[in-house]
Amino acid sequence: MAKKSMIAKNEQRKEIVARYAERRAELKKIIKNPNTSDEDRIEAQFELNRQPRDASPVRVRNRDAADGRPRGYLRKFGLSRVRVREMAHRGELPGVRKSSW
């Protein structure tokens, strides 16, 4: 089980990312556009740098939905490998069965 503070911090980051997502996309579009003047590009870069660090989506960590485990995360299930294995053995994941060949 991950620390509750780490799980809460990650949730807070998700909210910040969502809040700034639209403006970040606009600024990045200005920066990447080859027709943008150098002054506008530099101004957009400065504004992007002034945003909070947690506004960047790369700072959000994928965590197990059940207990917040940060490693061994499987996107398909939204759970860690440990939790997927436990639930699969108990038959709680529809369509998942033990492999045999």
Swiss-Prot record:
SUPFAM superfamilies: Glucocorticoid receptor-like (DNA-binding domain). The keyword Lipid metabolism does not apply. Keywords: Ribonucleoprotein, Ribosomal protein, RNA-binding, rRNA-binding. GO terms for cellular component: small ribosomal subunit. Coiled coil: none annotated. It comes from the Bacteria. GO terms for biological process: translation. One of its GO terms (molecular function) is rRNA binding. Pfam families: Ribosomal_S14. Belongs to the universal ribosomal protein uS14 family. Binds 16S rRNA, required for the assembly of 30S particles and may also be responsible for determining the conformation of the 16S rRNA at the A site. NCBIfam families: PRK08881.1. Part of the 30S ribosomal subunit. Contacts proteins S3 and S10. PANTHER family: 30S RIBOSOMAL PROTEIN S14 (PTHR19836), SMALL RIBOSOMAL SUBUNIT PROTEIN US14A (PTHR19836:SF23). This is Small ribosomal subunit protein uS14. It comes from Corynebacterium urealyticum (strain ATCC 43042 / DSM 7109).
